[in-house]
Amino acid sequence: MKKVLRVYGGVMRLVRLLPADSRPYYAKYARENFVNYREVDQSETSLDELFQRAYNHSLWVLKKYSIDESAATKLKEICFE
């Protein structure tokens, strides 16, 4: 559970780097996804897949807004530890 909260916090920190007008959308999107997946099977494999998906989606959004991917380094460390 702690890792899930750390990943969520990492995603929300990245949302703060986005342009002000797009932050509410992505903050809501991230929250809804984390809430929807809280019922997921707690096997290690499925959580790892969700963490990888969160990281990949974060990279896509950063790239969309021309933000350097290195901003997601900490999230990568959390997701793949």
UniProtKB/Swiss-Prot annotation:
Signal peptide: none annotated. GO terms for cellular component: cytosol. It comes from the Eukaryota. Belongs to the complex I LYR family. LYRM9 subfamily. This is LYR motif-containing protein At3g19508. The lineage of its organism: Eukaryota, Viridiplantae, Streptophyta, Embryophyta, Tracheophyta.
